[in-house]
Amino acid sequence: MPLDVALKKKYYDEVRPELIRRFGYQNIWEVPRLEKVVINQGLGEAKEDARILEKASKELALIAGQKPAITRAKKSISNFKLRKGMPIGLRVTLRGDRMWIFLEKLLSVALPRIRDFRGLNPNSFDGRGNYNLGLKEQLIFPEITYDMVDVPRGMDIAVVTTAKTDEEAKALLELLGFPFRK
């Protein structure tokens, strides 16, 4: 049963027709759309204490609405006291309705709660139509209360689109309501 997510409805009712008008697409499948959102949290300190990974995993599951996968070290690096296979982070890939729900929450609740927020950096596109942003703490999400947090942990959020160029991706995200700096 598909959920009625306001941001998804906005994409189909307003954003897609506007993108077709702006870029003159001939085929509906040419129109850029959101493919997935990947949330990554690097936890270098987890190699000493497994409880850190557990706590961070619970927090990320609350934020994303989906249990995160543990990322492990690909190689051993002696300077970092790191062995191959050690858990060093968490990752969640959101698609479909969960992706739309997360983005709606990010845009309407989380980003406005950031102190001194002046807008997202418009230069964080990767050249292939994907957007990356970093958050410094998890407290900006409504599911995380102040009492739950022992250490502020940041995360990287990658918004993957089917757009061919950064210009198309920026137009898509702007129309969806991403607050870019001017």
UniProtKB/Swiss-Prot annotation:
One of its GO terms (molecular function) is structural constituent of ribosome. Part of the 50S ribosomal subunit; part of the 5S rRNA/L5/L18/L25 subcomplex. Contacts the 5S rRNA and the P site tRNA. Forms a bridge to the 30S subunit in the 70S ribosome. It comes from Thermus aquaticus. GO terms for biological process: translation. Keywords: Ribonucleoprotein, Ribosomal protein, RNA-binding, rRNA-binding, tRNA-binding. This is Large ribosomal subunit protein uL5. Coiled coil: none annotated. Gene3D superfamilies: 3.30.1440.10. This is one of the proteins that bind and probably mediate the attachment of the 5S RNA into the large ribosomal subunit, where it forms part of the central protuberance. In the 70S ribosome it contacts protein S13 of the 30S subunit (bridge B1b), connecting the 2 subunits; this bridge is implicated in subunit movement. Contacts the P site tRNA; the 5S rRNA and some of its associated proteins might help stabilize positioning of ribosome-bound tRNAs. The keyword Ribonucleoprotein applies. InterPro entries: Ribosomal_uL5 (IPR002132), Ribosomal_uL5_bac-type (IPR020930), Ribosomal_uL5_C (IPR031309), Ribosomal_uL5_CS (IPR020929), Ribosomal_uL5_dom_sf (IPR022803), Ribosomal_uL5_N (IPR031310). Belongs to the universal ribosomal protein uL5 family. HAMAP family: Ribosomal_uL5_B. GO terms for cellular component: ribonucleoprotein complex; ribosome.
